[in-house]
Amino acid sequence: MVLRKVVAILLAILPIFLFAVEPIKVVRSEKEIVVLTRFEEYHFDLEKGILKDFYTLVDGRKHVFTYGNDGFDVLDEGTPLTVIEEPIVTGVGKVSEGFSDEVSIVYNYGYVKKIFTIKNNENYTFFVDIESSKPVDVTVPRVSVDTSTDRYLENYFASFNPKTRTLVLLKHDEGLLFEGTLKVNGQKRFIVFMGPNKRTLIKKAFPEDYDVLIKALVNIPGFNKWYDSVFYGLVWFFWWLKDLTKNFGWAIMLFTLIVRLILYPLYHAQTKSLINMRKLQPQIEAIKKKYKDPTKQQEALLKLYREAGVNPASGCLMLLIQLPIFMLLWSVIRYYVEEFAYSGSFLIWKDLSAGGFSNNWLFLVITIVASYYTTLLTSQDARTAWQGIIMSVIFPFLFVGLPSGLFLYYATNTLIQLAVTYYTYKRYKIKGLTTRELLGLPKKA
């Protein structure tokens, strides 16, 4: 009864610590305008009206682009134009801290007007509108100095950096591309994707041309990794689950459950091996006491394992097989961090991309409690149980700063682990410890 009241109170106060999608912030200084979204940081020069630097803000601050005469400079017969007045910053969805929907920066060069528009979404996409009363050239950005990773496609320009695994995709709609510049006469809009090499985001940015783009991009050295066929198979399966459930939170839980069901035979084999070893433990201890010589002791143990049909290494082998699989699954969930932030709430969590104790404490409690009971089920003595419990308390705190979507995966996996362990040990009639036994208390009369 008390536990129910505590949980009810915690659930009531949790939304206080949660927040919705952050607005776009604009910071102006003497030399530049900085635009900050949840995952992007743009630096625009005031005098030239060009993009100076671009950073992504997932997993720290990563420098993706720096200006090298390729930041959407406007050239008239090869001469760069400079703005003739202070740029104008406008936006949609004005709030106290910035703009909720989009921000536009307007540069006036006299006979040329240029507008950068940045929307508040997960796609790393922005727009550049050019309006000119005479023919001019506009430079296109590159994320790598190595031009061998450039690709010139119909209506598109691509630049890829294998070291940072970032790219630029610029849609120019029949603009003539020559030596890194585009010909503009009249009005022209460029759609620009600048960010990490994530195919789901590329598909959202350019859905109508996605297949053509990927076909060209995979031929760039370093664009693909050797495990991409498996990895992206899981990525698109998760995408399908999200479309099915209409929510990333439910998709994470369903994804975790399905994968654990598929991997159950491996886990069952591992657990069965551990149970068999537990049954042999009295005989193993007797052999260790009887034979002090390491060689004779090893021979006796091998004979015991052979007669019992037990392979002591099989449990570890099954665990080693599962580890890379779970690391791959973790990477799949992590892949969607940007989309967690812009895909609505899940139960009481408004933003599955947010991390920290205030967002993850409930997952922390669930994980620790589930791990506690799993440890009791699998332990033979209080000393071993305490070691496992201490680890199960410390280990989740290492994840507390991660996005809630990742912690949801971890917590769901821990709950499924508890359920599977309980079922397996019940099936084989293996008794674990009770809380009273753990604390060294006598059994109830």
Swiss-Prot record:
<dbReference type="GO" id="GO:0032977">
    <property type="term" value="F:membrane insertase activity"/>
</dbReference>
<keyword id="KW-0472">Membrane</keyword>
<dbReference type="InterPro" id="IPR019998">
    <property type="entry name" value="Membr_insert_YidC"/>
</dbReference>
<comment type="function">
    <text>Required for the insertion and/or proper folding and/or complex formation of integral membrane proteins into the membrane. Involved in integration of membrane proteins that insert both dependently and independently of the Sec translocase complex, as well as at least some lipoproteins. Aids folding of multispanning membrane proteins.</text>
</comment>
<feature type="transmembrane region" description="Helical">
    <location>
        <begin position="313"/>
        <end position="333"/>
    </location>
</feature>
<dbReference type="InterPro" id="IPR047196">
    <property type="entry name" value="YidC_ALB_C"/>
</dbReference>
<dbReference type="GO" id="GO:0015031">
    <property type="term" value="P:protein transport"/>
</dbReference>
<feature type="transmembrane region" description="Helical">
    <location>
        <begin position="6"/>
        <end position="26"/>
    </location>
</feature>
<comment type="similarity">
    <text>Belongs to the OXA1/ALB3/YidC family. Type 1 subfamily.</text>
</comment>
<feature type="transmembrane region" description="Helical">
    <location>
        <begin position="388"/>
        <end position="408"/>
    </location>
</feature>
<keyword id="KW-0812">Transmembrane</keyword>
<feature type="transmembrane region" description="Helical">
    <location>
        <begin position="248"/>
        <end position="268"/>
    </location>
</feature>
<keyword id="KW-1133">Transmembrane helix</keyword>
<protein>
    <recommendedName>
        <fullName>Membrane protein insertase YidC</fullName>
    </recommendedName>
</protein>
<dbReference type="GO" id="GO:0005886">
    <property type="term" value="C:plasma membrane"/>
</dbReference>
<feature type="transmembrane region" description="Helical">
    <location>
        <begin position="352"/>
        <end position="372"/>
    </location>
</feature>
<dbReference type="GO" id="GO:0051205">
    <property type="term" value="P:protein insertion into membrane"/>
</dbReference>
<dbReference type="InterPro" id="IPR001708">
    <property type="entry name" value="YidC/ALB3/OXA1/COX18"/>
</dbReference>
<keyword id="KW-0653">Protein transport</keyword>
<keyword id="KW-0997">Cell inner membrane</keyword>
<keyword id="KW-0813">Transport</keyword>
<keyword id="KW-1003">Cell membrane</keyword>
<comment type="subunit">
    <text>Interacts with the Sec translocase complex via SecD. Specifically interacts with transmembrane segments of nascent integral membrane proteins during membrane integration.</text>
</comment>
<dbReference type="Pfam" id="PF02096">
    <property type="entry name" value="60KD_IMP"/>
</dbReference>
<dbReference type="InterPro" id="IPR028055">
    <property type="entry name" value="YidC/Oxa/ALB_C"/>
</dbReference>
<keyword id="KW-0143">Chaperone</keyword>
